[in-house]
UniProtKB/Swiss-Prot annotation:
Single Gene Ontology MF annotation: RNA binding
UniProt name for this protein: Splicing factor, suppressor of white-apricot homolog
Record-listed Phosphothreonine modification sites: T639
GO cellular component, one term: nucleus
Organism, scientific name: Mus musculus (Mouse)
Length: 945
């Protein structure tokens, strides 16, 4: 739980800068404040449920039982139980001081400005103000002189086909400039209806009046906030100086603004423009006749003066409000006028006259309320904003809505420029009434309601993606429950439009319709499932190949057949079928989700292909049609040879991939085995080196390092066995101490040593009976442990007796340096006694020291008056050299240590002869094995190179 930084103090000063103490000071002055902070690391665990509860405010409780004020348990307001002392009506300054009406109004405005950000998005408001400001600028620029970008077709542009005569264009330009100057500098005369006070100055020119008038009109419509914005934006524009309070035209501006608010003033600029429009046609014709000799400009190239693009776009969509009081009367009159006429003798229903479209303004407006879809279908326009969709389409005029009564066809107006399609019952008079009845009754409940422009691109895009990726994509999107894709639900009002677009894109993705011209055309929506299911199952022949690409999406208009579909009219097109064989690449995307590797079952592959092809074709919605009837799916028909070829190709690719993976796995396995073999060889060589030469730990470490170099070159030093003794190996070993590795003394000397040891043992037993019981069992057990294993395997065994015998003086400071240099991993035994056991042979110099120490121990054993303190003083170097390996047992007494050391020496010399013979045999066997392994490794290296 606690991190590495736990408990770390961070001294800081209040001001953020730590003050350093002076050279003589202690740093704890009165002006210095320290903050001691202890930090501990902690883990944070993700708890989604707790986070969701916090976000929903489930941890909040009502304050004092008031559900309007919710606080958490750490809120300081929990300590307040009564706020009556702080209520505004009792304790505010306004209790004694009553504001006047003007002051209260100003205070209310100030409060509104203070708390504006609480209930208003300031960024959105600023963007709206910018937009309104742009509109004002455009309105100010539309005074007839110029637009945002004006047209100039004068002599400034060189035309090589025209003679270069500049006299007439220059005269015309001067004339136009004079007219503009006259218009702009025309003095302003107040109109008769405008009674301007005598103390208010009038603007000098008509242009200045127009600017003031438009600004006042704009501020009246948008609010006083825009006046402040205009004043700030146009601070450097001299034309808007009248907005300043100290300007002489500001009273006139305020007067015009007040008159507009009261409705006593109409904008003069608009009335002038209306007069110009009325008198425009006659005067324009005369001017055109006069100016034909000049530079003629076609009327379509003129800049539009007062026409708004937004109004043009919205004009065809104007519909009478169905909630209007007069709308009920209009609908009643239309229902009376468009009542079904008695059918004629041949059974065809009576057609409503063309007068119905123009007689009423509502029907005339609805004539244009549609838009055409890419496949020839046209839908009714979306309702105007603020009107419910269901009520709008249910309360449409009778001349436009669908009648479900038998014998009455729909009267949806056709697109402009085309005639209304003929009724479908003219061909067969006997069965016409029944067919029309079934169609209209089946299609009446569902109507394609076009979505508004902000939702329509989303629906179109999703329908296209579903047609391309299959129904699984639609299911996954629906499962997310996103608000933007609610139209995927069957109960949604735009679901019919979505299904229609999906079917349209499916036909487009499938390469177009492949039905014959003689079969009845299917309706594009799910509402005509009964007819389309029956006709589609029989109609499309199976041998028809899929048209390649998407080229057959182009259709030509047919002559007589069309399906009248409520608010959806489908123009009839005769499908053109090209028997072009589909390319291999066009069919490959159907096999995206292919089979697993090494799966050879053809049945599984075929079932997967069928499943993928069905997922890419949309099924009709179950809400609109009975589930037993299914629409025929248009999937591409592949021949048996193509399927077999593709399956064989896929199997071959799968097998190749599996073989490549197996090869890679085998290669990696072989490389790992080679690495393991090399590691084993290195360890075996190192182990044999330690068997042949039981070196001290430092030399073992050096030897291990040198074996890496030996392995790389492939050369292994092979020790020679001469007379059962191992000759020294010179490679990789320091040449300083050769006497430690050779067995120079012959067998006779060893026998003499054994005899001397027996004599010493008898003396120690007789002279020191006190320590007999403690030294004897230890020495015996130790000798047993020694003889139970060869000396080669006793590299890590520690001696129990820690006696400091004089023989340890042979370990010089050089040995200590080697022990320090070797890493701890190689220092398996830290006691010098263990290393002494490994090196059984000693140099003649060491033997002399040994004999002297023996004579000293004999003398000390005879005279027991020697104190331990003197012994410690006599051997300071040995004690200091091996202080790391001395245990607390040594404090028992120097005599006990002496007896243990002597017994250990005797045991070591007795076992030396036996150990040497056993070791030589083991070494011979192991060296034979090593030579065989080295020969094999050399062969491997040569073959690998």
């Amino acid at each position: 739980m606690y991190g590495a930084g736990g408990g770390r103090a961070k001294p800081e000063r209040k001001g953020g800068v730590k003050e350093e103490a002076g050279p003589g000071g202690t740093g704890t002055g009165g002006n210095r404040v320290e903050l001691l902070v202890f930090g501990y690391a902690c883990k944070l665990f993700r708890d989604d449920e707790r986070a969701l509860a916090q976000e929903q405010g489930q941890h909040l409780i009502p304050w004092m039982g008031d559900p309007k004020i919710l606080i958490d348990r750490y809120d300081g307001r929990g300590h307040l139980h009564d706020l009556s002392a702080y209520d505004a009506e009792y304790a505010t300054w306004n209790r004694d001081y009553q504001l006047s009406e003007e002051e209260a109004r100003v205070e209310a405005l100030c409060d509104e400005e203070r708390y504006l950000a609480l209930h208003t998005d300031l960024l959105e408001e600023e963007a709206r103000q910018e937009e309104e400001y742009k509109r004002l600028s455009e309105a100010l620029a539309e005074d007839g002189n110029y637009s945002a970008v004006g047209f100039t077709y004068g002599s400034d542009y060189y035309d090589p086909s025209e003679p270069t005569e500049e006299e007439e264009p220059s005269k015309q330009r001067e004339k136009n400039e004079a007219e503009n100057l006259e218009e702009n500098e025309e003095p302003f005369i107040a109109p008769l209806g405008l009674s301007v006070p005598s103390d208010v100055e009038l603007p000098p020119t008509a242009k200045m009046h127009a600017i003031i008038e438009r600004t006042a009109n704009f501020v009246c419509k948008q609010g006083a906030q825009f006046e402040i914005m205009l004043k700030a934006k146009q601070a450097r524009n001299s034309q808007f100086d009248f907005l300043r309070f100290d300007h002489y035209l500001n009273p006139y501006y305020k007067f015009i603004q007040k008159a507009m608010k009261e409705g006593r003033y109409t904008v003069l600029a608009e009335s002038k423009n209306e007069e110009k429009k009325k008198s425009g046609p006659t005067s324009d014709n005369e001017e055109e006749d006069d100016e034909e000799d000049g530079s003629y400009l076609h009327p379509s190239l003129f800049a539009s003066k007062k026409s708004s693009r937004l109004e043009e776009l919205m004009k065809p969509l104007k519909v009478v409000d169905p909630d209007h009081p007069l709308a009920a009367l209009v609908r009643k009159a239309q229902a009376d006028s468009s009542a079904p006429a008695p059918p004629t003798a041949d059974g065809t229903p009576a057609q409503p006259s063309q007068v119905e479209y123009t007689a009423d303004s509502t029907v005339a407006a609805m004539y244009y309320s549609y838009y055409m879809l890419p496949d020839g279908t046209y839908c009714l326009a979306p309702p105007p904003p603020g009107i419910d969709v269901a009520t709008y389409y249910s309360t449409l005029p009778a001349g436009v809505t669908v009648s479900s009564s038998p014998g009455v066809t729909t009267t949806v107006p056709p697109p402009p420029g085309t005639t209304p399609p003929p009724p479908p019952t003219t061909a067969e008079p006997s069965s016409g009434v029944t067919s029309t009845t079934t169609t209209t009754s089946a299609l009446a409940p569902v109507a394609i309601i076009p979505p508004p422009p902000d939702i329509q691109p989303v629906i179109d895009k999703l329908a296209e993606y579903v047609a391309r990726n299959g129904l699984k994509f639609e299911t996954s999107v629906r499962a997310k429950n996103d608000q933007r894709f609610e139209f995927l639900q069957p109960w949604h009002q735009y679901n019919a439009y979505y299904e229609f677009k999906k079917q349209f894109f499916l036909q487009k993705e499938g390469g177009g319709s492949t039905q014959a011209a003689s079969t009845a055309e299917e309706a594009p929506t799910e509402t005509a499932v009964e007819e389309s299911g029956e006709a589609g199952e029989d109609g499309a022949p199976e041998g028809m190949a899929e048209t390649g690409g998407r080229g057959s999406g182009k259709k030509e208009a047919g002559s007589s057949k069309s399906t009248v579909d409520g608010k959806l009219v489908k123009a009839s097109f005769a499908p053109i079928s090209f028997a072009i064989k589909a390319k291999e690449n066009d069919l490959l995307p159907l096999e995206k989700n292919r089979v697993k590797l090494d799966d050879d079952s053809e049945e599984d592959e075929e079932s997967r292909e069928c499943q993928e092809s069905t997922s890419s074709v949309a099924n009709p919605s179950p809400a609109a049609a009975p589930p037993s009837v299914a629409v025929e799916e248009k999937k591409p028909q592949l021949t048996q040879e193509e399927l077999e070829a593709k399956q064989a190709k896929q199997k071959l690719e799968d097998r190749l991939a599996a073989a490549a993976r197996e090869k890679l796995a085998q290669a990696s396995k072989e490389s790992k085995e080679k690495q393991l073999q090399a590691e084993r060889k290195r360890k075996a060589a190192l182990f044999l080196q330690t068997l042949k030469n039981p070196l001290p730990e430092a030399e073992v470490g050096k030897l291990e390092e040198s074996t890496f170099g030996v392995e790389d070159t492939g050369v292994m030093p092979c020790p020679l066995l001469v007379g059962g003794r191992t000759l020294p190996i010179l490679e990789g070993k320091p040449p300083e101490r050769p006497s430690n590795r050779c067995r120079d003394p012959p067998r006779e000397e060893e026998r003499e040593k054994k005899k001397k040891k027996h004599k010493k043992r008898s003396r120690t037993r007789s002279r020191s009976p006190k320590y007999h019981s403690s030294s004897k069992p230890r020495s015996r057990s130790h000798s047993k442990a020694k003889h139970s294993l060869p000396s080669a395997y006793r590299t890590v065994r520690r001696s129990r007796s820690r006696s400091r015998s004089p023989r340890r003086r042979a370990h010089s400071p050089e040995r200590r340096r080697e022990e320090r240099s070797v890493p701890t991993a190689y220092r398996m035994s830290g006691s010098p006694g263990v290393s002494r056991k490994r090196t059984r042979s000693r140099s003649p110099h060491e033997k002399k020291k040994k004999r002297r120490s023996r004579s000293r121990t004999k003398a000390k054993a005879r005279s027991q008056s020697t104190s331990p303190s003197k012994q410690a003083a006599q051997r300071p170097s040995a004690h200091s050299a091996h202080s790391a390996s001395i245990s607390p047992v040594e404090s028992r007494g120097s005599s006990q240590e002496r007896s243990r050391g002597v017994s250990q020496e005797k045991d070591g010399q007795i076992s030396s002869a036996i150990v040497s013979s056993v070791q030589s045999k083991i070494t011979q066997d192991l060296m034979a094995k090593v030579r065989a392994m080295l020969a094999a490794s050399k062969n491997l290296q040569t073959s690998a190179s």
